[in-house]
Regions:
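Extended substrate/RNA-proximal surfaces in nucleic-acid metabolism proteins
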Residues: 1-116
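Charged catalytic cores and adjacent phosphate/nucleic-acid-binding surfaces used
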Residues: 8-11, 58-61, 84-102, 106-174
Length: 174
């Protein structure tokens, strides 16, 4: 579906620009990291890749240390990630023949936001089972799925990042 591919390409370019802005901020803070050090084979380089590069260069002990010191939202090297509005994302997914699932609802800062999104933006499902969702969250998201008659999904969110749960594929079961 061409419009989805175009939007993904636009977001990929915005993400590349974001990486350059992060590296510029890091340079201004005294950290010398090149683009290639962040993961030369990955076309979707983000904060975890930058954090791993900083650890590899010996600036920090762990990826979590990097996030705590520099890359957290509002941190000195943080650059906001380009995002789609929920209605645009759901519409593109549906027009491409896909199923739109609200991912990581437990990570949203406003506890009422998942229900607002599900009830207003035609999501087909909600990710109930995820490392960030404790048992109470899972019960809440299951009730929401039942209330709006939407699909239940789950995922491990494994990214292969050292010291970040899940640390290995298969540790978190859905």
């Amino acid at each position: 579906y061409a419009p989805l591919l175009e939007k993904m390409n636009e977001l990929r370019h915005a993400r590349e620009f974001r990486l350059l802005k992060m590296l510029e901020k890091l340079h201004n803070l005294g950290y010398e990291i090149e683009v290639e050090a962040c993961d030369p084979n990955n076309r979707a380089v983000g904060r975890p890749h930058v954090a791993k590069a900083l650890v590899a260069k010996g600036y920090f002990e762990t990826v979590q240390d990097v996030f705590y010191a520099l890359l957290h939202r509002g941190g000195p090297a943080y650059v906001p990630q380009p995002k789609l509005a929920p209605n645009e994302a759901v519409d593109l997914i549906h027009k491409a023949g896909g199923i739109a699932v609200l991912a990581h609802p437990s990570e949203l800062s406003d506890g009422n936001l998942p229900e607002y999104l599900v009830s207003n933006f035609a999501f087909d499902g909600i990710e109930v089972y995820h490392p960030s969702a404790d048992e109470a969250d899972q019960e809440k998201w299951l009730a929401l799925a039942k209330k709006y008659n939407i699909l239940v999904s789950g995922g491990s969110d494994f990214h292969g990042i050292p010291d970040r749960f899940p640390t290995e594929l298969g540790i978190f079961e859905v």
